[in-house]
Amino acid sequence: MPHAPIFILGSHKSGTSLLRSLLDGHPDLFVIPFETHFMALLGRWITYSYRKQAPVDDANFLEGLVEILESYAQSVDRQADVVLGDRLDMDAVRAFVGEMDEADDPIQALTVLKQLLPQVVEGLDSAQGKRAVEKSVEHLEVALELAQTFPKAQFIHIVRNPYANMVALRKFKAKDQAYPLINKVYKSLESGYYW
């Protein structure tokens, strides 16, 4: 990968999506317009309260990526982090993925994303010669592995006032149901402050 990636880290509702949107205007950056969760798709153990996953030995990155993109394509929630429904060509995604070799490590996964997304997301510029910017909240837990895999990577860790963060997260999670239990909110914020 010719250019070291930039990883945006932080807990839910801390401002990571805003920063991703601001960086998207930079001509030298290829900003992935959604949370890829690529380390989880590679089978990594994730303990972040809202994205828990046990380690998976036989993870299929490409299959998981198609599932995530399908969920984004079907989303009509205008308050969601990303709405790609009318910009994403799922037939092109399936055709592209059908011709790709499986990604087994973070470098391969990020390379697949840089090759795939400009071809299937309408209006997304080419990633050729640009630094990738990736934001997935649970990647805070695997930041050391990312730093070892991408030694020249840069990390932007956003820390928001915990009280404001807690209120925003509880309001966000309450839009579909009652307010979430404070314990789960607290645990997700706690993991966002200890990197």
Regions found by a protein language model. Give the residues of each.
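Amphipathic alpha-helical recognition patches that constitute DNA-binding helices
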Residues: F7, L18, Q154
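P-loop (Walker A) phosphate-binding loop of NTP-binding proteins
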Residues: G10-S11
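A conserved segment at the C-terminal end of the G1
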Residues: S17-F30
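Generic beta-sheet signal
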Residues: I32-F34, I158
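PAPS-dependent sulfation machinery
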Residues: E35-E134
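PAPS-dependent sulfotransferase catalytic domain
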Residues: V97-I107, T111, V120-W195
